[in-house]
Amino acid sequence: MEAFSLLNYWKNSGGAVTFLPHSSESSSSSLCRYSAGESIGTTTIVTSVTETEDEEADENDDEGPFFDLEFALPAEEEDTDGGVGREGDSDCTDGGCEFKFTLSSCSGGEDRVDPDSLDDVFFKETIVEEVEPPTSSEQQTCSVKAPAAQLSASILKTATKLRVFMLGMKKSKLIQAKSEANFGSEDLDKQTHPPPPLSLSPESQQKSTVTVNLKVEEVPIISLFSRENSSKNSSSSSSSSSSSSSSLKKQNGNESVVSDEKRFVMMQKYLKKVKPLYIRVSRRYGEKLRHSGQLTAPSSARSTAEKADSPVATKTNNKPGNNINIPAGLKVVRKHLGKSRSSSSTATTPSSTTATVTTQSESRRRDDSLLQQQDSIQSAILHCKRSFNSSRDKDPSVLPRSVSEPSSYEK
């Protein structure tokens, strides 16, 4: 057994891979060449071809080639070994890039390929036939003698990052189910009806190459409902958080303002309802206090008002034919005013200047009270002196007693 490696990497749009022998006599080695177009990512495919030429295989007419495919991917490496009864995983993703490579088998001079040997490799996609012009006579004879089997293939790149479209899931599932059904029917047709031997015509040369369409796509892992750019996501998230916080603050401020306005309106309504009742109660209470007859003078305002009303009351009482009930408080005030010396002056003042008169009368009253005290003291002193002088003149024996006890006389 001889292992041959197929080196070269495909890029985005596709290319052709062809097994070409180095020499027809020395060995049956084949080299896989690949031509690639525009690319998105980078992926390396290493394919080894093993041809069996044992005696037992010749006796059993098992002349088909066996392919061992090994894929080295940038994200992760995965080996795919060709064996009987093993089927490689294959899916179709929406919006991928296509790769095309052509496999032409060189089995060393066999006229046909056993369809049973094709069970070693399974593919699922349509065939795209492509012809490469032979570069030498050896290659031409090899391609003529060894027609390739027509295989339907689609290989999914086993990368760790895949893009998922929610809207295209149903469509992709339906397409996959249809492709699997078509593949099963083609398999049965191949097993029951082997292909007829091909003639040496240009059509057979065209069918000697098989082109496989591959779709590979490299995308970053992102969530289904987020944007592809992380900076945009961060800026949008920060802006959304700031806008949400500002909106919450505005809502709280508006709610506080509305609550304050509601409170103010409620207080105004309450005061409007309570104010007339308060005024009525205060008026009634003032009238009761005025007509109760037990008024006292706790504050200067009430005392001044009573003093202002007292001259008018005295005038009305002095007039003949006026029988008016005067409260007891006013009577007391009138008595006090009658005793003072300034009662006459306050009685003659007009009622229009009651405020000024009351202040003047209070000051005069204080002055008069001081004068009265001084007069009484002076009169007492004079009385003592007179009595002392008169007693000394009348009775001289009192002198030593008065001299011995001067304090009694001073008192």
UniProtKB/Swiss-Prot annotation:
Give the principal location in a single coarse category: membrane
Keywords for the protein's UniProt record, in alphabetical order: Cell membrane, Membrane
InterPro entries according to UniProt? MAKR2/5
Show the GO cellular component annotation of the record.
plasma membrane
Composition bias, kind Low complexity: at what positions?
A: 231-247, 340-361
Can you tell which superkingdom this protein's organism belongs to? Eukaryota
Where does the protein end up?
Cell membrane
* Region listing for Disordered, in residue ranges: 184-210, 227-259, 287-411
- Biased composition of type Polar residues is found at 248-257, 293-303, 313-325
What name appears for this protein in its UniProt entry? Probable membrane-associated kinase regulator 2
Please spell out the taxonomic lineage of the organism that makes this protein. Eukaryota, Viridiplantae, Streptophyta, Embryophyta, Tracheophyta
What gene is this protein a product of?
A: MAKR2
